[in-house]
A protein has these predicted regions:
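All-alpha prenyltransferase/terpene-synthase fold signal
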Residues: 1-249
């Protein structure tokens, strides 16, 4: 498994190099990097028997898209909460998101990955549509909210799996990333910060205790499905255990 450790570490460093723009570093927060998404992408593409240079290229470019989306969302979330945040800082954060997105298009176009660009563009479209529904509390059922959570968190990875014919990874990605997002929302809610998922659920269920029960129930169900999946897919379980350990170091 040493090659997995080395490959993962090398890819993470390549991604960091792309993100280290000297001007942005001085004025805005460092972009959030979802280590688990890197690990899932690396593990899935590793199982597709791609060469390490190909894996590195795809993981870095796809994570640039994810970070661009997360950076733009960070501006939207903070705009109403931090009235004293400088206008310049917000503008630079938006520009940073655009910069990361532009890097993604550039890197994929250099390799003429037109089909993958189209697939990821569809994923971006779906993510943005579900973000709008979540923030506008446009859902009619609890299942609709959960669907939006899963799409927002996993669409880029799901489209990548479709492109490389890795359908056996898709359920696992859904369980892990859905659970992670709900855990993050619970932490935000506990700290009395803005939680889009809690607010969306509250739009349907008014009782605060019931809202917490529902979201905790979703997390337990996803964790159960994740564990059951790993029991039945030892190949993914082995890769996952190595990458999980690495992503925590």
């Amino acid at each position: 498994m040493c090659d997995i450790y080395g490959g993962y570490a090398g890819i993470r460093e390549k991604l960091m190099e792309k993100l280290r723009h000297p001007y942005f570093i001085n004025y805005i927060e460092e972009p959030f990097i979802d280590e688990e998404k890197i690990a899932l992408l690396y593990g899935a593409l590793k199982s597709a028997n791609l060469h390490i240079e190909q894996i590195e290229h795809y993981v870095v470019t796809i994570m640039l898209v994810q970070i661009a989306l997360d950076t733009h969302e960070r501006v939207s979330n903070k705009a109403g909460e931090e009235a004293n945040e400088s206008h310049k800082r917000r503008q630079l954060t938006v520009l940073a998101g655009d910069y990361y997105s532009g890097l993604y298009y550039y890197l994929l176009s250099m390799n003429r990955d037109i089909v993958l660009i189209r697939a990821l563009a569809e994923g971006i479209k779906e993510i943005n549509e579900h973000k709008i529904m979540l923030y506008q509390k446009a859902h009619e059922t609890m299942d609709d909210i959960m669907e939006s959570v899963v799409v927002i968190e996993s669409a880029l990875l799901q489209k990548t799996c479709d492109h490389f014919h890795l359908s056996h990874w898709k359920p696992f990605i859904t369980y892990v990333l859905g659970k992670n997002r709900l855990q993050k929302e619970c932490e935000l809610h506990a700290e009395k910060q803005h939680s889009p998922v809690f607010q969306a659920v509250q739009g349907i269920m008014k009782d605060q205790a019931e809202v917490e029960t529902v979201i905790n129930g979703w997390m337990m169900e996803l964790r159960k499905k994740e564990n059951q999946f790993l029991e039945n897919h030892t190949d993914i379980s082995k890769i996952n255990s190595v990458l999980r350990d690495k992503s925590k170091t």
